[in-house]
């Protein structure tokens, strides 16, 4: 059963992001480059977080590392925002589809998905490697829900990073500091809540994280200009 669980959890975590990539990014080279660049910047934030966690006192407290990791991620989200905004004219000149620069929310969406995919991969890839077989006993006989929960958490963080970038980029464009604060503090909140998984409170963390994901998705939809009317047209394929 290890191999079916491996594929099941892989599709739970990366199925929707892969579909987003195929249908909205894969046919545009500029979007692919932006996605890869965003993933690279997230890796830089992870590198700095690792160095900080290794060198600074209090590193025995995991929450300490989580807080600074979130701060570094948001700092690099701002850096890529500044880079994309400063290179819009160049992107417009080389882009086959000019919507990528004409609609600023597309840049935010693509970079956010890049952030999310690489974050989800680093969160889940070791777990996927362990579940692919052969079967092993947990050190303390952990619950069988661990793998599915990890996959669901990874999907949540991928979607959240996508939504956060849409909100974050627009907030700086419009000087909306409330939305900037929402992105930073909801990222902190979701990350710290996952620490409860150490006590096997999986139901609690999943419910809270997906509630935040839904609320953040609605906010990102409204920020991007979505309305209830446009949502109904989307659902009914009009």
UniProtKB/Swiss-Prot annotation:
<keyword id="KW-1133">Transmembrane helix</keyword>
<dbReference type="GO" id="GO:0007220">
    <property type="term" value="P:Notch receptor processing"/>
</dbReference>
<keyword id="KW-0914">Notch signaling pathway</keyword>
<dbReference type="Pfam" id="PF06105">
    <property type="entry name" value="Aph-1"/>
</dbReference>
<comment type="similarity">
    <text>Belongs to the APH-1 family.</text>
</comment>
<keyword id="KW-0472">Membrane</keyword>
<comment type="function">
    <text>Essential subunit of the gamma-secretase complex, an endoprotease complex that catalyzes the intramembrane cleavage of integral membrane proteins such as Notch. It probably represents a stabilizing cofactor for the presenilin homodimer that promotes the formation of a stable complex.</text>
</comment>
<feature type="transmembrane region" description="Helical; Name=3">
    <location>
        <begin position="53"/>
        <end position="73"/>
    </location>
</feature>
<dbReference type="GO" id="GO:0070765">
    <property type="term" value="C:gamma-secretase complex"/>
</dbReference>
<dbReference type="GO" id="GO:0006509">
    <property type="term" value="P:membrane protein ectodomain proteolysis"/>
</dbReference>
<dbReference type="GO" id="GO:0005886">
    <property type="term" value="C:plasma membrane"/>
</dbReference>
<dbReference type="GO" id="GO:0055037">
    <property type="term" value="C:recycling endosome"/>
</dbReference>
<feature type="transmembrane region" description="Helical; Name=5">
    <location>
        <begin position="152"/>
        <end position="172"/>
    </location>
</feature>
<protein>
    <recommendedName>
        <fullName>Gamma-secretase subunit Aph-1</fullName>
    </recommendedName>
</protein>
<feature type="transmembrane region" description="Helical; Name=7">
    <location>
        <begin position="201"/>
        <end position="221"/>
    </location>
</feature>
<comment type="subunit">
    <text>Component of the gamma-secretase complex, a complex composed of a presenilin (Psn) homodimer, nicastrin (Nct), Aph-1 and Pen-2.</text>
</comment>
<dbReference type="GO" id="GO:0050821">
    <property type="term" value="P:protein stabilization"/>
</dbReference>
<dbReference type="GO" id="GO:0030674">
    <property type="term" value="F:protein-macromolecule adaptor activity"/>
</dbReference>
<feature type="transmembrane region" description="Helical; Name=6">
    <location>
        <begin position="178"/>
        <end position="198"/>
    </location>
</feature>
<dbReference type="GO" id="GO:0005783">
    <property type="term" value="C:endoplasmic reticulum"/>
</dbReference>
<dbReference type="GO" id="GO:0016485">
    <property type="term" value="P:protein processing"/>
</dbReference>
<dbReference type="GO" id="GO:0007219">
    <property type="term" value="P:Notch signaling pathway"/>
</dbReference>
<keyword id="KW-0812">Transmembrane</keyword>
<dbReference type="GO" id="GO:0005770">
    <property type="term" value="C:late endosome"/>
</dbReference>
<dbReference type="GO" id="GO:0034205">
    <property type="term" value="P:amyloid-beta formation"/>
</dbReference>
<dbReference type="InterPro" id="IPR009294">
    <property type="entry name" value="Aph-1"/>
</dbReference>
<feature type="transmembrane region" description="Helical; Name=2">
    <location>
        <begin position="32"/>
        <end position="52"/>
    </location>
</feature>
<dbReference type="GO" id="GO:0035333">
    <property type="term" value="P:Notch receptor processing, ligand-dependent"/>
</dbReference>
<feature type="transmembrane region" description="Helical; Name=4">
    <location>
        <begin position="105"/>
        <end position="125"/>
    </location>
</feature>
<feature type="transmembrane region" description="Helical; Name=1">
    <location>
        <begin position="6"/>
        <end position="26"/>
    </location>
</feature>
């Amino acid at each position: 059963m290890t191999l079916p669980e491996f594929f099941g959890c892989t599709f739970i975590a990366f199925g929707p992001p892969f579909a987003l990539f195929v249908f909205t990014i894969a046919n545009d080279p500029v979007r692919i480059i932006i996605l890869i660049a965003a993933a690279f910047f997230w890796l830089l934030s992870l590198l700095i977080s690792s160095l900080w966690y290794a060198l600074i006192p209090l590193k025995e407290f995991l929450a300490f590392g989580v807080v600074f990791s979130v701060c570094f991620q948001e700092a690099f989200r701002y850096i890529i925002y500044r880079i994309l905004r400063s290179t819009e004219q160049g992107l417009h000149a080389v882009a086959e589809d000019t919507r990528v620069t004409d609609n600023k929310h597309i840049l935010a969406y693509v970079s956010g998905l890049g952030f999310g995919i690489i974050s989800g991969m680093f969160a889940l890839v070791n777990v996927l490697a362990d579940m692919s077989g052969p079967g092993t006993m947990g050190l303390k006989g952990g619950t069988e829900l661990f793998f599915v929960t990890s996959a669901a958490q990874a999907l949540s963080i991928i979607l959240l990073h996508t939504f956060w970038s849409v909100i974050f980029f627009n907030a700086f464009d419009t000087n909306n500091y409330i939305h900037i604060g929402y992105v930073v503090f909801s990222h902190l909140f979701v990350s710290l809540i996952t620490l409860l998984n150490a006590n096997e409170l999986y139901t609690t963390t999943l419910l809270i994280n997906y509630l935040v994901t839904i609320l953040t998705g609605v906010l990102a939809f409204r920020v991007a200009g979505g309305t209830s009317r446009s949502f109904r047209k989307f659902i009914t394929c009009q």
